[in-house]
From Swiss-Prot:
Gene Ontology molecular function terms on file: DNA binding; DNA-binding transcription factor activity, RNA polymerase II-specific; zinc ion binding
UniProt-recorded name of the protein: Tropolone cluster transcription factor tropK
Biased amino acid composition, Polar residues: 7-20
Stored Gene3D superfamilies: Zn(2)-C6 fungal-type DNA-binding domain
Gene (UniProt): tropK
Compartmental location: Nucleus
Residues passing through the membrane, by range: none
Amino acid sequence: MSVAIKMSTNTVGGQSTRQPPGSACLHCRNKKMKCDALQPRCKNCFNAGVECIRSNNYSRKRSAQRDHIEGPQDRVETSDAEVYDVQPKFNPGLFNLDFHMDSFYDMDYNFLENITPESFPILSPLDSLPSLIPSETVECSQPQTVIETAGILAPPLNDPINDLMHEDLDQLYLDRVHRLIPILHRRRYFSWTRSPNRTDAQTCLQFAMWTLATSLSTQLQHLRESFYQRTCSLLDKFTAQDTAAPQIEYAQACILIVNYDLMKENFRRGWTSAGRCIRVIQLMRLFEIDRSKGRNDREDWIQREEKRRAFWMAYSLDLFISLRGEWPLSLTGTDFVRLPALDKDFDNSHYVEMPFLGTVLSGASSSVLSPWAESIVFATIIRRITALTSELEGLSPGSSSTNVWSKIDLLRNILKSRLASLSFKHQDSHFPFSDDPMETFMIMIAQSSVLYLYNTQKSFSRATESSQNISMALQYEAQMAAQEIANLSTSILHMSRFKIHPFTPLILAKCMEFYKSNQNLDEITQAAVKQIYELLRHISKVNNIAVEYLS
């Protein structure tokens, strides 16, 4: 005889706390956890980062008698089969559930890796990009090697980003973008990023940051297109407004989108975005941020430093794009903008007064410069060298060459002084260098400046007897510089390709051009060219600038 046992039920406020029968999802049933039946995902599924599935066919009739369970083996097999059909490959060991809000800078991105397109409603495809992005009518002969997003459903633009996703995206940006584009003051950003009263410009910057961050992640490609569309929409909105002085966040968003367009779209689109960015910088008059007359001394140093960094990043983009396309510079007024401070001073809000670019080039400053500031100095020297090349092309056949060789010698002396300073700073360094991508890029661009100067004097055929020594010295120095770049390429191969400076392919292509035009210099030329070519292929997986140099 079976014994009937009356089950007791706990009540709170007159209502039963027992979970409604049949309401638990498959994940909670499988883990034997209490399910709160929230939509679209219960709390347990949200924390585990898995899809919350409820099966209408899965129901268990609970017997009123504890000692009366019919067919236990059959029921267990049925339950296992149903769970296996829904999630045949789920492995709990793949997910890290130990997320701590206090250790923000040590978090991982496992939660975002489990976001699927099915988590969002279906969107109708956009017919075209925002109006400021030009339509591409010219066929591109370069294959797109980046991960394609066609056919992947994007989240709706008004879909809220929860706190966990928000923090993961911010951390991804700091890990993979901020060190290469150090224009953002982190404390200032975190002071407003969660504010419900943030401005449209701040929202635009936020989405621009996430656009670039997701583009450098293999797991988040399905999010980047919607972020990109939202950013472009906000940028178009600001462009249509008649505002006298745009906010600094708007300029920062423009800078990030230029980098995105160059790396993930194509050179023409990046060039067009750069034009908009430069106009914003000029409209804000950032080229005179440190002009003594009329400067607002009450403005805090961090805000001025952010504006300086926005100017110098736009200047760097303008310079590298002009080198790539052999065009004149658009931003030329650098006399009233101090060079960016060291990153540690900037991040810690430590006031310092940096020298001007002209002071550094004249050798009248002994200030310690950041790797980014050093790269600005060497990039400016390269630009002066290319301007001298244009001057040589315009010389008449009968003109004197004395003045030209004096300019070449002057630039060579400036380079020797800057390179000697770098050699002293890195005298204890060995290959491979540290994983600081900006420092590695700075050393590469410093060496490439010697290659640019060598090409300039080589194109000038009217060498006098007094200039033979300069020519021979430059040839030897160019060989050494090319070898240094080849050595650095070995170091870069050991870095994450997501952390390589976007314009590294420009330097590698210049080195490869030097080797190919001087194949009789040494016996290791072919090996060096092959190594650089392999590095370009390595970078081309995430950077379309490298794709253009591979053809």
